[in-house]
Amino acid sequence: MLTDILTGRLLALPDGPDAPLAPITRLPCPLGAVAPLAGRPGHWVAAAGTGFCRIDAAGRADWIARPEDDAPVPMRMNDGVADPHGRFWAGSMAHEATGKAGSLYRLDRDGRVTRVLRDVTIPNGPAFSADGAVMYLADSARGVVSRYPVDRASGDLGAPEPFVTLGSGSPDGMTTDVEGGLWTAVWGAGQVHRYRPDGSLDRVVDVPAGQPAGLCLGGPDGRTLLVTSAHIGLAAPGPLDGAVFAVRVDVPGAPAAPYRPAYRADAP
């Protein structure tokens, strides 16, 4: 699954490379990210509009919370992911990318939404270690990926430390693999980077598009790196800007973690 953020679309990848993306649903607002809802095939929790909603198998949305409704500038949700302990995390940003207007939110299993970080401009990720004890978060506008310790029971974050600072391009979507490596799309550089847990650069994958945006490790063995790209803002988009790419890699990723609500999460 992937989202086309600004059009509000949730899309499924086709079986063949020449087939079009299959539409699942379209919301009347930006759709930043989704995670599967545990025990409910075809149901999703989403970072959308100014907050969080559930999407049922018919594509209908049921809103959980809209924490950015009263922000001083127009806001939207951006990237997000479920952690290994069943919580869902997502960042917000200003429509015009106003500096430090964004936040990182955590949707707990009991349905409560907590703002856990402020003063972010364009949050991307987060990504988590396999045990959920480490979180990586990019602020794309600053070119920085930070690493946070996470209390696995509560989801509380400890003090951050710098992990990666890019000199060219901006860190965008991220994921981790089973060896603890961090993969990040590098917007503006036409690349994907893999970093070892110590922050050293391990691998660079060139992508035939200038703005790689989101990524995941999937396929039957978890060794297919899927990379989305965008053509927004390009004066002269190339033929593959906006395409989705697949690259075989050596280290697999883990299956996508679901959101595991501790309350009854029936979508309408």
What kind of feature is each model-predicted range?
Residues 9-11, 51, 102-105, 144-146, ...:
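A short loop-to-beta-strand structural motif that recurs across blades of beta-propeller domains
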Residues 19-27, 62-70, 112-118, 159-165, ...:
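A short beta-strand motif characteristic of beta-propeller blades
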Residues 28-49, 69-87, 116-134, 165-181, ...:
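Beta-rich, blade/repeat-based domains predominating
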Residues 39-43, 57, 105-111, 193-203, ...:
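Flexible "stalk/tail and boundary" regions
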Residues 56-116:
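Hydrophobic alpha-helical segments and helix pairs
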Residues 143, 148, 164-197:
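Loop/turn-rich, solvent-exposed surfaces of beta-rich toroidal or solenoidal domains
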